């Protein structure tokens, strides 16, 4: 029911969630998991919010460990996912509207994505963005290696140089930090002016002339090979 207010009902879980956590969750439902989750998290997400963070007793470095499985946000249309850790392969495949922040992903991330926003605060696997025709991606790339893993047949890549897009990115990272207590997100925000320069923005080529707020630096975009 889209008339429900955000966070109308919050369900808190602990341990390891099975497949399809939060599938088709609508606005008003918030799921908080202290632990980890399997494949298909947020499948068909339709306005709800999903938060996955390590258990308080965990000594693992969140950004270096997988916390959600493969094929996350498959076919999602709206809502939010914040996961303090890495996702598996085919992350956000066919996402058409959800906003998500994670801390790394496997191969084929954002495959066939048509809408929404994906922020990845860690390394990506090969063939990122294959068939991506809509939406926006932001990759934290302090080592400067992400562009070699992008599928450049349909994408352009550039610095996050326009205030509108900078604001979108920062707002999502702030929400991620607030929801998950992410150490990586907090460190980035504490040094924002410096860390912003380590992000690259990913956009499908066919979206460039449709953006209300242009990227502003198309001339420096990475061309297709």
Question: Could you describe each region identified by the protein language model?
Answer:
Residues 1-225:
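Long, distal/terminal scaffolding or interaction modules
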């Amino acid at each position: 029911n889209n008339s429900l207010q955000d966070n109308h009902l919050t369900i808190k879980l602990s341990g390891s969630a099975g497949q399809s956590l939060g599938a088709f969750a609508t606005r008003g439902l918030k799921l908080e998991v202290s632990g980890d989750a399997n494949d298909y998290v947020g499948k068909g997400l339709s306005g709800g919010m999903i938060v996955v963070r390590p258990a308080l007793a965990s000594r693992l470095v969140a950004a270096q460990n997988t916390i959600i499985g493969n094929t996350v946000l498959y076919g999602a249309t709206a809502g939010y996912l914040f996961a303090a850790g890495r996702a598996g392969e085919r992350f956000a495949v066919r996402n058409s509207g959800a906003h998500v922040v994670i801390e790394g992903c496997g191969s084929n991330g954002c495959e066939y994505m048509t809408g929404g926003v994906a922020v990845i605060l860690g390394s990506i696997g090969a063939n990122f963005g294959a068939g991506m025709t809509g939406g926006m991606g932001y990759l934290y790339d302090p080592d400067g290696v992400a562009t070699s893993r992008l599928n450049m047949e349909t994408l352009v890549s550039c610095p996050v140089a326009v205030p509108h897009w900078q604001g979108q990115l920062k707002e999502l990272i702030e929400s991620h930090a607030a929801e998950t207590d992410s150490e990586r997100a907090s460190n980035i925000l504490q040094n924002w002016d410096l860390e912003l320069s380590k992000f690259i923005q990913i956009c499908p080529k066919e979206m460039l002339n449709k953006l209300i707020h242009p990227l502003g630096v198309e001339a420096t975009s990475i061309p297709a090979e």
